[in-house]
UniProtKB/Swiss-Prot annotation:
NCBIfam families: PRK02155.1. The lineage of its organism: Bacteria, Pseudomonadati, Pseudomonadota, Betaproteobacteria, Burkholderiales. NAD(+) binds at D75, G76, N149, D150, R177, D179, T190, A191, Y192, A193, L194, S195, A214, Q248. Its cofactor is a divalent metal cation. The gene is nadK. SUPFAM superfamilies: NAD kinase/diacylglycerol kinase-like. Pfam families: NAD_kinase, NAD_kinase_C. This is NAD kinase. Its EC number is 2.7.1.23. Belongs to the NAD kinase family. One of its GO terms (biological process) is NAD metabolic process. It catalyses: NAD(+) + ATP = ADP + NADP(+) + H(+). The keyword Heme does not apply. InterPro entries: ATP-NAD_kinase_N (IPR017438), ATP-NAD_kinase_PpnK-typ_C (IPR017437), NAD/diacylglycerol_kinase_sf (IPR016064), NADK (IPR002504).
Amino acid sequence: MQVTSQFKTVALVGRNNTPGIAEPLTALALCIAKRGFEVVFEADTAAEIGVTDYPALRPAEIGARADVAVVLGGDGTMLGIGRQLAPYRTPLIGINHGRLGFITDIPISDMREIVPQMLAGNFEREERVLLEARIMRDGNPIYHALAFNDVVVNRSGFSGMAELHVSVDGRFMYNQRSDGLIVATPTGSTAYALSSQGPILHPQLQGIVLVPIAPHALSNRPIVLPDDSKVSIQIVSGREVNVNFDMQSFTSLELSDTIEVRRSRHTVPMLHPVGYSYFATLRKKLHWNEYPSHEEDPKP
């Protein structure tokens, strides 16, 4: 079958160490290949499920070769591959094989119907922002990372509160004693930041949110900043303070280390089925639909 879609090569990425994921991945690969698309697998995914019929590529090779990546897993899988493919602007399609699934919005039961429709051009596209962070020690950068959801400075479970000196665009904001501080994107506002009483930011809002974790002073409240802000967090006191990036990579900090966070120049293109609604996602995932909506007749 000749492909007339804007997509020619489709990469499949699966959630690691997940029993039962081989069958849906191989079924999806066959479904896509039968429609004339070239199918490649992310290398670790291919090795884990024993796929040998398709090329196995590292993320950088996927970025250079694939036109779109279909991710079967949970939000964590999307976060990980999203960071790696962001420099290549490879669009992502998410199939939920996890628990919550805020950004993997296609049910696995519907993937063989919906994914081919999207590959044929029937989708809605949006751009999700990333954060970039670097750790400065004695005036020198020692670590750099991207974050799809959030950059989190926090204490270990066996140490006391950390004192953090926070400034925005070079202007002093406050000294905060707390268990830590979350700097989140709109995408990340429904992750750790939400559980720490932060606000929900619509994904298309141009902002980042700072959310204290269990602050000593109850007046230390979350604040939303313009997304062109540069946030600097210096470690004033505290033992065993770490910084995490999407809770998937971390590094230990020393006193006087400074974490500089700003919006990355990279964005992640995300593709959704036609009719996708962010508000429908919130209703479903946060159980807002426990009460009848205006679109539904109340039950008698």
